[in-house]
Amino acid sequence: MKTLVIAHRGDSKNVPENTIAAFKRAMELGADGIELDVQLTKDGHLVVIHDETVDRTTNGEGFVKDFTLEEIKKLDAGIKFGEKFAGERIPTLYEVFELIGDKDFLVNIEIKSGIVLYPGIEEKLIKAIKEYNFEERVIISSFNHYSLRDVKKMAPHLKIGLLYQCGLVEPWHMALRMEAYSLHPFYFNIIPELVEGCKKNGVKLFPWTVDRKEDMERMIKAGVDGIITDDPETLINLVRKGG
């Protein structure tokens, strides 16, 4: 079975992360899907940005939660990446869904609900997914497993993926207990026991964030189901060559 190529925040190696331009580029390259992050604005809109503050990726300063949608849309999310990307904006989740349309394309949505908690984000996300008919094309992931538990309670049919960083023992048991579709470990944790345990128990495995060619080759050889990477072009070429 082919290893899925999931572009982390889009083609974030070459284009400003979590922007429409980055997602469009990932689609043009032939990625199987994208990974993106959602947070809530002050007035309750789902916006796509990784950090809890806008400082690193835009020309603004402050917490995402303190901006209204109108205010956050005035920020330049491309200028720090280079002049040619000036004018890129922080997209809403709806705008990303509109870009993808009815294409057979995976969207891994990470709920950012840790440093800043966003009460009600799960309900808003589920509503957006249903509204745009993305139920079969999304995996909702988070480091906050309470948030994922809430998603599963409200929408049992949606796929969830458990994000984690440390070397957990037999984590597929936790995945099965939570009725999770997948595990999303930091790629250093990929060992034969983990791959075998997941395969035996029907749990998909999507390690992150794999950017070096030699690590991509190791992940493909290990037999993971998909790879989350900042460099989708290199990974696509490797997968096409058979690893």
Curated annotation (Swiss-Prot):
It comes from the Bacteria. It catalyses: a sn-glycero-3-phosphodiester + H2O = an alcohol + sn-glycerol 3-phosphate + H(+); sn-glycerol 3-phosphocholine + H2O = sn-glycerol 3-phosphate + choline + H(+). The keyword Calcium applies. Its EC number is 3.1.4.46. Pfam families: GDPD (PF03009). Ca(2+) binds at residues 35, 37, 110. Changing residue 112 to A: Retains 4.7% of activity. Coiled coil: none annotated. PROSITE patterns: GP_PDE (PS51704). The active site is at 8 (proton acceptor), 50 (proton donor). GO terms for molecular function: metal ion binding; phosphoric diester hydrolase activity. GO terms for biological process: lipid metabolic process. This is Glycerophosphodiester phosphodiesterase. PANTHER family: GLYCEROPHOSPHODIESTER PHOSPHODIESTERASE, CYTOPLASMIC (PTHR46211:SF1), GLYCEROPHOSPHORYL DIESTER PHOSPHODIESTERASE (PTHR46211). Belongs to the glycerophosphoryl diester phosphodiesterase family. Changing residue 9 to A: Retains 10.7% of activity.
